[in-house]
């Protein structure tokens, strides 16, 4: 599959099966607007891909779907519920994610130290706190060693500290507002 450069799928196609386009190293463009399911290793080692845009509908992306796609530098996630966990994207260098504020994509970016940009404004969002939509604190990315966890972050009330939230950090004290 080294000659394939572009995939244009009709709206009737909503799923891409496991390994479907694996090692299509010349693939540069694919329309994923109507896709709701992407199988594991579906685009494994598609080194020609530089950008991905996931559509308005939630997309179920299986394990390592984009693993080895070493040249992807921009992922746009139009649906706030689409998760990028386990997709293979966290291993990429020079990746930026564009999505909605307080989305699952932003949480993924924050957890993995990937630059995140607001889809509406294009502005880079830098958070000290890694917090999900249910108020769970998953980490702190600031420089302080004595930290005070705020009552809310980005309008979300904090109610729990997540697993390994401060593991291997340089924090010396934690207090809650």
Predicted regions and their residues:
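Consensus positions within tandem repeat domains that build extended binding/scaffold surfaces
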Residues: 17-22, 39-44, 62-65, 88, ...
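Structural signature of tandem-repeat unit edges
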Residues: 1-15, 24-37, 47-60, 69-83, ...
């Amino acid at each position: 599959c080294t000659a394939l450069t572009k995939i244009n799928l009709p709206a009737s196609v909503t799923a891409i099966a496991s390994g479907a386009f694996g090692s299509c190293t010349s693939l540069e463009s694919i329309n994923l607007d109507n896709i709701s399911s992407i199988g594991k290793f579906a685009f494994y080692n598609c080194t020609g891909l530089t950008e991905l845009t996931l559509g308005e509908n939630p997309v179920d992306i299986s394990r390592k779907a984009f693993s080895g796609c070493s040249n992807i530098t921009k992922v746009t996630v139009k649906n706030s519920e689409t998760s990028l966990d386990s997709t293979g994207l966290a291993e990429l260098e020079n990746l930026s994610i564009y999505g909605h504020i307080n989305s699952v994509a932003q949480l993924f970016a924050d957890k993995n130290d990937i630059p995140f940009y607001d889809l509406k404004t294009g502005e880079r969002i830098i958070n000290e706190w890694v917090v999900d939509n249910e108020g769970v604190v998953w980490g702190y990315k600031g420089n302080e060693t004595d930290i005070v966890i705020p009552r809310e972050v980005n309008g979300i009330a904090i109610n729990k500290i997540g697993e390994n939230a401060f593991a291997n950090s340089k924090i010396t004290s934690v207090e809650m507002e």
